[in-house]
C-alpha cells in the first residue's frame, strides 16, 4: 500500500520543497504536488480567494516553471526518498477553465494542463489530477459537458503514458456517477 498526501495539506508558508521534505518526515510514501498559473493570472473573487489558498501562489509548480525547475524537484524528491505520485491543481477550474468558451482562455487552459502532464513525466508521476472546468451562468450544461469531454480527450492523447484523473468538485457539473461514466 502507498500512502500519500497532497501538498495543500501543509502550511501556506511551505514551498514545494518544504512540503516534500515534511511528507517524508511524517512517514508518507508519496506526495501529490500542486500546480497553478503564474502569478497575476488568477481572477479576483474566485475559488482561490474563497478557499484562501492564494497564499500558496509561487510556492507551487506553475506555468512559468521550467523543465530544469521540475527536474530539480524530482532530484529533491529522489534524494529525500519520497515518490511524487501525481500532479494536481485548480488551474483548469477557475483560473483557466477547461470549459472556457473564449479561445485565448481555452488555449491557456490546454497549455497549462499539457504543462502539468509534461511535468508529471519528468517527475516520474503517473497521474495528473484535472478539474474539467466549470459551468457558468452564461453556459448551457450540455455545451460545457461536451467541451470538457472533448478537451480532456485531447489532453489524454497528449500524454498517453500518464493517467488523467478527473476530479468532481463544486464546479456546477458532473453531479452524478452517471455523468462521470459517460
Language-model region placement:
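Structural motif corresponding to alpha-helix initiation and N-cap regions
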Residues: 13-17, 66-71, 174-177
